[in-house]
Amino acid sequence: MTHRVDQEYDYLFKIVLIGDSGVGKSNILSRFTRNEFCLESKSTIGVEFATRTTQVEGKTIKAQIWDTAGQERYRAITSAYYRGAVGALLVYDITKRQTFDNVLRWLRELRDHADSNIVIMMAGNKSDLNHLRSVAEEDGQSLAEKEGLSFLETSALEATNVEKAFQTILGEIYHIISKKALAAQEAAAANSAIPGQGTTINVDDTSGGAKRACCSS
């Protein structure tokens, strides 16, 4: 979802949070949008979203962050919300190996439903629980590189790298949008320079000295 608006913000970007239930997606959302953390947060039911407006290279970007439930029974519901997303944060819990093992399944589902140009970052969350770690940071980095994703370890509790993760995603999206806009402008300029394109005004002399304007394209 990329809308151009001239009042409150320049662009609206839809970003989805995906990953297994319990990896901390809701707290990542609340940390980024409200700078809050809830120790007793419950599992998301269905889909929730929140927004935050931020600056990217002088442009005002409104980030619309969708928190998609990780439970199996909501998968059919959440798949519909991939449509229109231009960014995704794929989250696993560094203390639970199974959530990391499921990353490829989430990635496959995302790529099946989302736009092929979607910007994806993988985040190993709960880095504050390093003493309980079951997924090495190198494993996360290696998988991300293999799949062509950005990667960070985050802590919603300590607010570590949460801001950086979203700013990186938003920055990459903005660069893609800017390149597309520039390419479109260059294509339009090239087309206008080609003879025979557009509207031509022909002025013909008539026998009475009057002039007639004929439009042809």
UniProtKB/Swiss-Prot annotation:
Where in the cell is the protein located?
Endosome membrane; Golgi apparatus, trans-Golgi network membrane
- Covalently lipidated residues, kind S-geranylgeranyl cysteine: C214, C215
- What highest taxon heads this organism's lineage? Eukaryota
SUPFAM superfamilies the UniProt entry points to: P-loop containing nucleoside triphosphate hydrolases
MF GO annotations: GTP binding; GTPase activity
Q: Which GO terms describe its biological process?
A: protein transport
Q: How does it sit in the membrane?
A: Lipid-anchor
CC terms in the record's Gene Ontology section: cell plate; cytosol; endosome; endosome membrane; Golgi apparatus; plasmodesma
Instruction: Name the residue ranges of motif: Effector region.
Output: 41-49
Keyword NAD set for record:
no
Kindly list the positions annotated as binding GTP: 19-27, 38-44, 67-71, 125-128, 155-157
What tissues is it present in?
Expressed in root tips.
Q: Which SMART domains match?
A: ARF (SM00177), RAB (SM00175), RAN (SM00176), RAS (SM00173), RHO (SM00174)
**Which cysteines bridge via disulfide bonds?**
none
Q: Which UniProt keywords apply?
A: Endosome, Golgi apparatus, GTP-binding, Lipoprotein, Membrane, Nucleotide-binding, Prenylation, Protein transport, Transport
Start and end residues of each stretch annotated as Disordered: 195-217
Briefly, what is this protein's role? Answer: Intracellular vesicle trafficking and protein transport.
The family line of this record is: Belongs to the small GTPase superfamily. Rab family.
Q: Which PANTHER family match?
A: DRAB11-RELATED
> What protein name does the entry list?
Ras-related protein RABA2c
Its gene is RABA2C
